[in-house]
């Protein structure tokens, strides 16, 4: 029996160990390895000229060659020289399933822990052995992932190509001899379900496939009646991508990649599985909750009882699929999903810290620290109203210019402040980061702001104008002028993006969506009228008064501003479930998830007397299998009022709730002045409280809860 066969037999005998390892260890674990040669603390990838070199086994799969090409170009961006292949190179790469006996023997002599990855698909090892950086993949994809992991270690973000980001130049690159990384996927099938992508051509599919490769995703998903994508076979084959059709995954296996292997999946987590809510229209905090919540598992047979899921489900046979229309619009959400699919501890420090680290990797720590507040405010404002939902098919939004000193203009003013901060930070960035900053930060912020201004000012013009008298109503015309000016600026912004990189993103920039169309106005204006009337419009800098001036008869709070809380009852022999704060989720940008039986308590004083309307806002439930999402509210120890917050997402009310990102329920109470208490309790699982308001003007209509900061 030859050496290679002996090792494989030993590895197969340790398959159980390897499976347990993938479930318990971080997927990309950094481990200490005792140095053999204390005089050589680092292994340098670069030679005296700064050029990186590598060597690889003789036979490799097409996807490995693609990864090597990307790596070579990545190193050119970092060092100024493309990486080159060299027999004596400091980086030695091995694709396990295509090694010759001689190559396998050489690898064995280097002491790499092959047994930890050999039986696991897509796994890899990177570490120093005998003064060489050893890179080993269990199969073609694992080898490709490991190669591109080297790019990440050198400072090249997986998103660099997609956002035209230049890595920081380095004269040398090295790895300490005591470091090693073992990557074992936690989720076997990880990928995308592309919606509305019939416009995609092979070149664009190739770009998406490259992104998937860098994110270590391996599956494109299609379910009849849900996803209309038709995938390009040549691209799929060359990138070794699995195709899933109606819960059956097909992949090519074997040394010559000619054997079809089909697997039926019972447990699948469809992230944002709704045609009207692709992942780019969902707050990062909610995406994270979906990823961490087993109740979002979907089964082929529709057997979704919890007992079935907990008994049958394990991560290794599960697929995570993100429903996405345009990957360029959801980089943070997709990055979170891909990282968690490999490492269950990837967001252990919290989503805000993850966002900070993600931005640091893109722009450097100094710029990243400045950009983070911009993105957090962007996620807050878009959680109040996503740009895609600004153009209303069922009439106007509920924004009301007559309440709280004009809440409509106050909302737009927050965008004005955000735009100003964005421009100021842009000026501080080096030229090689400007394009990436525009694509990741400035364009999302400015387009969201301009869409909001276009639609809300048009709504204001329609509300003000009397039938047939638009041309005689200067106030209505001024609002229309602001709307049209925003529309013209939006077109210029899109045109700039379409020209970026010689037009390489022209097919990815959506300029024909409802939110991009001309505003619906009660009349027309000439260019000269737009310019003149815009100067007569509501001046947000001068005309807006402090919100506190308008909130005497209303108490509004974010859910996280509680006085105290009560944990859920503890199951026998287990610890009580804690409440969870959910940053980057909700109008509050920090909603509170309550386990069943947990409650929040608020204490406050009010000088108001009489009837009041209490309104509770929770995050909509997207769980099709959940029948109830009940919350009880008790004011001043009165009999609790039970509110059913679960809605049919296909109903008109359900759509309104999705568009505003909140389900609202109200009831009336009569109160005296003095101190009051409110207790909000979850009666079912998956209850996420966002805000509440107690309004003594019971007929008031408004959209944004007037929470004082």
Task: Give short role names for the model-derived ranges.
Residues 90-93, 132-134, 189-191, 218-220, ...:
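Beta-sheet entry/capping signal
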Residues 92-155, 207, 215, 480-534:
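Intrinsic-disorder/low-complexity accessory segments
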């Amino acid at each position: 029996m030859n050496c290679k066969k002996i090792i494989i037999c030993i590895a197969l005998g340790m398959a159980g160990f390897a499976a347990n390892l993938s479930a318990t260890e971080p997927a990309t674990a950094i481990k200490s390895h005792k140095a053999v040669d204390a005089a050589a603390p680092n292994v340098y990838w670069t030679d005296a000229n700064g050029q990186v070199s590598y060597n690889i086994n003789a036979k490799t799969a097409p996807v490995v060659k693609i990864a090597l090409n990307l790596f070579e170009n990545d190193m050119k961006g970092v060092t100024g020289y493309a990486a080159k292949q060299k027999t004596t190179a400091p980086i030695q790469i091995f694709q396990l399933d295509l090694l010759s006996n001689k190559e396998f023997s050489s690898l064995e002599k280097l002491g790499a822990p092959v047994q930890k990855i050999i039986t696991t698909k897509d796994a890899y090892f990177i570490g120093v052995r005998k003064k060489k950086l050893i890179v080993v993949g269990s199969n073609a994809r694992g080898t490709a992932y490991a190669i591109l992991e080297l790019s990440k270690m050198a400072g090249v973000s997986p998103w660099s190509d997609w956002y035209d980001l230049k890595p920081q130049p380095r004269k040398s690159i090295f790895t300490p001899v005591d470091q090693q990384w073992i990557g074992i996927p936690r989720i076997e099938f990880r990928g995308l379900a592309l919606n509305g992508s019939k416009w995609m051509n092979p070149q664009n599919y190739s770009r998406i496939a490259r992104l998937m490769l860098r994110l270590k995703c391996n599956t494109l998903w299609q379910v009849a009646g849900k996803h209309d994508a038709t995938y390009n076979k040549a691209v799929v084959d060359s990138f070794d991508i699995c195709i899933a059709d109606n819960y059956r995954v097909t992949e090519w296996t074997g040394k010559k990649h000619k054997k079809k292997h089909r697997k039926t999946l019972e447990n699948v987590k469809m992230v944002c599985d709704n045609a009207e809510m692709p992942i780019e229209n969902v707050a990062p905090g909610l995406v994270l909750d979906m990823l961490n919540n087993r109740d979002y598992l979907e089964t082929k047979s529709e057997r979704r009882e919890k007992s079935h899921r907990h008994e049958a489900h394990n991560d290794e046979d599960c697929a995570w699929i993100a429903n996405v229309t345009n990957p360029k619009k959801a980089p943070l959400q997709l990055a979170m999903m891909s990282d968690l699919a490999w490492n269950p501890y990837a967001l252990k420090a919290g989503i805000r810290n993850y966002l900070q680290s993600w931005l640091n990797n893109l722009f450097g720590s100094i710029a990243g620290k400045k950009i983070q507040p911009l993105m957090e405010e962007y996620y807050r404002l878009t959680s109040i109203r996503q740009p895609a939902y600004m153009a209303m098919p069922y009439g106007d939004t509920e924004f009301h210019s007559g309440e709280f000193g004009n809440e409509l203009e106050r909302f737009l003013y927050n965008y004005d402040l955000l735009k100003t901060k964005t421009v100021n930070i842009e000026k501080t960035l080096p030229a090689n980061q400007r394009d990436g900053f525009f694509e990741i930060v400035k364009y999302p912020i400015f387009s969201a702001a301009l869409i909001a201004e276009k639609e809300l000012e048009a709504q204001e013009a329609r509300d003000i104008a009397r039938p047939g008298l638009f041309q005689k109503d200067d106030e209505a015309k001024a609002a229309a002028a602001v709307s049209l000016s925003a529309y013209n600026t939006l077109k210029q912004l899109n045109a700039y993006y379409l020209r970026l990189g010689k037009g390489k993103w022209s097919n990815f920039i959506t300029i024909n969506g409802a939110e991009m169309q001309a505003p619906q106005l009660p009349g027309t204006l000439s260019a000269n009228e737009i310019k003149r009337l815009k100067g007569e419009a509501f001046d947000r800098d001068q005309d807006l008064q402090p919100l506190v001036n308008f909130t005497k008869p209303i108490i509004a709070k974010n859910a996280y501003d509680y006085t105290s809380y009560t944990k859920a009852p503890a199951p026998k022999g287990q610890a009580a479930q804690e409440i969870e704060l959910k940053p980057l989720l909700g109008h509050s940008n920090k909603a509170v998830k309550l386990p069943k039986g947990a409650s929040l308590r608020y204490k406050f004083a009010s000088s108001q007397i009489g009837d009041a309307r209490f309104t509770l806002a929770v995050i909509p439930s997207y769980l099709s299998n959940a029948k109830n999402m009940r919350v009880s509210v008790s004011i001043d120890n009165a009999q609790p009022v039970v509110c059913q917050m679960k809605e049919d997402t296909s109903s008109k009310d359900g759509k309104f709730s999705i568009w505003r990102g909140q389900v609202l329920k109200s009831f009336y109470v009569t109160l005296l002045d003095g101190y009051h208490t409110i207790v909000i309790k979850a009666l079912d699982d998956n209850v996420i409280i966002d805000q509440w308001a107690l309004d003594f003007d019971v007929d008031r209509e408004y959209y944004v809860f007037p929470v004082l900061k």
